[in-house]
Amino acid sequence: MDVVAFFTEILKFRSITPDDDGCLKFIAEFLGDFEARFIEKNGVKNLILSKRFGDGAHLAFAGHVDVVPPGEGWQSEPFTPLMKDGFIYARGAQDMKSGVAAFVCACRDAKNFNGRLTLILTSDEEGDALFGTLEALKILKERGELPQFAVVAEPTCTGVFGDTIKVGRRGSINGKILIRGVQGHVAYPEKCVNPVHQIAPLLSRIAGHDMDAGSEFFSPSKIVITDIRGGMEVCNVTPSELGIMFNVRNSDITSADDVKNYLQSVLEGLNFELSLKQSSKPFLTDKDSKIVRAMSKAVQKISGVAPQLNTKGGTSDARYLAEFGVKVVEFGVINDRIHAVDERAGVKEVERLYLVFKELIENFA
């Protein structure tokens, strides 16, 4: 079974997060000469596949088989792959069964590799992502089997296949500000403490504020306000409190404590509460590391495109690998239809992705 046929088969599994619908078992049977360990926790299924070829480097591939719900309006049944005009349409085609198919087949077919290959597969990435890759990594650490290097096959390319390798990701800090005032009649503003009036002159110092100037691989860590509300939707009563919700996609330059200290200085003198939660931490893999150099070389050889290295986008399971000290990069197909109606992946992209991963493995000395 070639990579396109295998890709088509795994697209048929209705693996809406966190249900793998039997997809992981199918993959384990496909790679029958790899040692398989199934891990299940809180209704989440994970699979670790491993094979030692020699005493060289330990390289891992990671991905998820779960997908988001398809929604309505598709031109075909979302879990019945449709091949049309050089594309395969199905939910999960780009995000990320194309990547899974490519590295599974590459691990099966690669020759002359002298290290250890591990595949980490989960059905919990599109949901809470608490009992998936993270749980598998805990077990690998307990067994002393953490990989040195890893590739997460998320769809990274934006315009043409081969244009982007992700070498890191920004972190995510969610925050809430509650400003307390004194409710009163609008005719007697001197008797009120109006939190709307208090925050108004300060908003320009919060909304869109860059916590840092950015760096070679990270854009500035910006405070983005997502919600402001207060009052009772009436015109004659001032509010007793006002709430603000915000997010900061932070680089490795700015920490949650930096955000806390800045906002406390801006809000000094007000009666306020501030809460922050770092839901994911930023990471950056050195551009001169072995995995970055090897991936860049493989991508350029197969695609003919010199890939750019960046950290744009949201979070992914690569953050967990980085937290465990694994040098990790991300590379996959074009991502223009992820989570969309009529999600699709180019047949030639999938074939070339397979060749990129095979090239990487065979030359990862």
Curated annotation (Swiss-Prot):
Function noted in UniProt: Catalyzes the hydrolysis of N-succinyl-L,L-diaminopimelic acid (SDAP), forming succinate and LL-2,6-diaminopimelate (DAP), an intermediate involved in the bacterial biosynthesis of lysine and meso-diaminopimelic acid, an essential component of bacterial cell walls.
Residues that hold Zn(2+) 2 according to the record: D95, E126, H339
Cofactor: binding details: Binds 2 Zn(2+) or Co(2+) ions per subunit.
Protein's name according to its UniProt entry: Succinyl-diaminopimelate desuccinylase
Membrane-crossing segments per the record: none
CC cofactor: Zn(2+); Co(2+)
Any Pfam family matching the protein: M20_dimer
SUPFAM superfamilies (alphabetical): Bacterial exopeptidase dimerisation domain (SSF55031), Zn-dependent exopeptidases (SSF53187)
Source species: Campylobacter curvus (strain 525.92)
GO MF assignments: acetylornithine deacetylase activity; metal ion binding; succinyl-diaminopimelate desuccinylase activity
EC number: 3.5.1.18
Active site (UniProt): D66, E125 (proton acceptor)
